[in-house]
Amino acid sequence: MKNIRNFSIIAHIDHGKSTLADRFIQYCGGLDLREMSTQVLDSMDIEKERGITIKAQTAALNYKARDGQVYQLNLIDTPGHVDFSYEVSRSLSACEGALLVVDASQGVEAQTVANCYTAIDLGVEVVPVLNKIDLPAADPERVEQEIEDIIGIDAVGAVQCSAKSGIGVEDVLEEIVAKIPAPAGDENAPLQAVIVDSWFDNYVGVVMLIRVKNGTIKLKDKVRFMSTKAETQVEQLGVFTPKSVQKQELKAGEVGFLITGVKELGQAKVGDTVTLIANPASEPLPGFQEVQSQVFAGLYPVESHDYEALRDALEKLQLNDASLKFEPEVSQALGFGFRCGFLGLLHLEIVQERLEREFDMDLITTAPTVVYEVVLKNGEKIEVENPSKLPDIGSIETILEPIITATILVPQEYVGNVMTLCNQKRGVQVNMQYMGRQVMLTYDLPMNEVVMDFFDKLKSTSRGYASLDYHFKEFQPSDLIKLDIMVNGEKVDALSLIVHRQSAVHRGRELASKMRELIPRQMFDIAVQAAIGSQIIARENVKALRKNVLAKCYGGDITRKKKLLEKQKAGKRRMKQVGNVEIPQSAFLAILQVSDK
């Protein structure tokens, strides 16, 4: 056991952790050359394309160190994006050490800081590594100083390497052996193994990635999951070298995969503890949480007969992604569809893209919303995540909205812009800290403002230099109202929004004028109105297309022309009573882009 090293890699998107992982696998001979593809651990197409890691993957590598001993290095790959922070904390809790990979030309970013603090809180040994030192813009001294200023760990003499060209990779492996402690644990104690990740395989059902903390797990053992109380039998055990290799048993300190008869991902929750039925552990390992959805959106098929296909597709995605929640919902404007819950905006985009790409679905997505707590006058408390489900204004005592704490790292020259942006979004400044050339701002922001377009705005106002990390803080009472959009006097439920009273009129006007541009002209006038309750706050008209009925009259009597115009007017009036207006998909998307300029 003293020769096992469990570690993960913490890095910001694009700082090169997947490439570094590839180099480790190549160096330790985990795969032969024909099986090496770039970014071996990122197995989803969308992961490779966006260059991000979504699910945790592992590789068990045998490394012969310079001292002549063979060490088993278990690399647990972690996602770097803020939406997947729970997965990161689970991956880290399975390790004793973490490599902090920082791009030597770019320096430290906010997500790196957040994940690094998570690691330090979990008591994980953090080893700094500077990557991309072969770039002409690399400045190792400055970045070492930044790591010390911002994160507060000793970075003098941090290992320098370039994962792309392979320089210094061996030094990094030596550093892992030297700095990261061997796992602690007792092979003879009752079994406690934490589920680091789980995914669905078409042939064997659910595959769980586990880290054995105490005890030993063998083939054909009967096991129990401690949070769901489900019981099952071990069918297969083994390790990934990224290929799967079967084993008879896994002992304390090891990381490997476990396949049982479980068919549903909901039974094997990430962070849960597995123990033996015959000799159970007295308590589960700490740190397990149920994942809460933060952002909600409606997904509707463009063709209503695709509804069942969409349900199947969502169920299949849920097999691999336990944090995706969905329930059926009906909208008058869009027909049958689903209300889905996501971890954040990136998660929403990824799910939408996977549905379109892997399942060939044509989707309409409504504006993302967050959960509000509504206290009614009779003292009852309800949760509302769909604006059209908000009860009547008369029956509401208060509405509470979710507040997040955002940590923003930004170069000094853009601080003013970022602060202005946060104030526009009703943010409250909590802290401001100068660290070298960077400034760390902490703000409490309403989540509602963040899901709209905060991230894009933050990037554009800081020329892409600012980086953001956030976590949920609490619900706070706020002066919120529901804004309805009416087309031809009928409410379009899918376009309702919950907004702050101050910005309601402004938003209403912007939306109405945007809708006017996007709704195709019909044969009759269409009124687009924004309303709060029964009060109309903005109106725009989509002008009718009309035929020039006077084209055939040359000269002649005015009454003849009047007669033709009256006839046309009557026809338009009749049309308006029966005509219904198709609202194009672009109009729904426009709602997202209407910003508080």
Curated annotation (Swiss-Prot):
Residues 2-184 form the tr-type G domain. One of its GO terms (cellular component) is plasma membrane. It is a peripheral membrane protein. GO terms for molecular function: GTP binding; GTPase activity; guanosine tetraphosphate binding; ribosome binding; translation elongation factor activity. The keyword Magnesium does not apply. Keywords: Cell inner membrane, Cell membrane, GTP-binding, Hydrolase, Membrane, Nucleotide-binding, Protein biosynthesis. SMART domains: EFG_C. Gene3D superfamilies: 3.30.70.240, Elongation factor 4, C-terminal domain (3.30.70.2570), Elongation Factor G (Translational Gtpase), domain 3 (3.30.70.870), P-loop containing nucleotide triphosphate hydrolases (3.40.50.300), Translation factors (2.40.30.10). Signal peptide: none annotated. One of its GO terms (biological process) is positive regulation of translation. It holds the Pfam family GTP_EFTU_D2. The keyword Cell inner membrane applies. InterPro entries: EF-4, EFG_III/V, EFG_V-like, EFTu-like_2, G_TR_CS, LepA_C_sf, LepA_CTD, LepA_IV. It catalyses: GTP + H2O = GDP + phosphate + H(+). Transmembrane segments: none annotated. It is found in: Cell inner membrane. Its EC number is 3.6.5.n1. GTP binds at D14, H15, G16, K17, S18, T19, N131, K132, I133, D134. It comes from the Bacteria. HAMAP family: LepA. Required for accurate and efficient protein synthesis under certain stress conditions. May act as a fidelity factor of the translation reaction, by catalyzing a one-codon backward translocation of tRNAs on improperly translocated ribosomes. Back-translocation proceeds from a post-translocation (POST) complex to a pre-translocation (PRE) complex, thus giving elongation factor G a second chance to translocate the tRNAs correctly. Binds to ribosomes in a GTP-dependent manner. Belongs to the TRAFAC class translation factor GTPase superfamily. Classic translation factor GTPase family. LepA subfamily. This is Elongation factor 4. It comes from Neisseria meningitidis serogroup A / serotype 4A (strain DSM 15465 / Z2491). The gene is lepA.
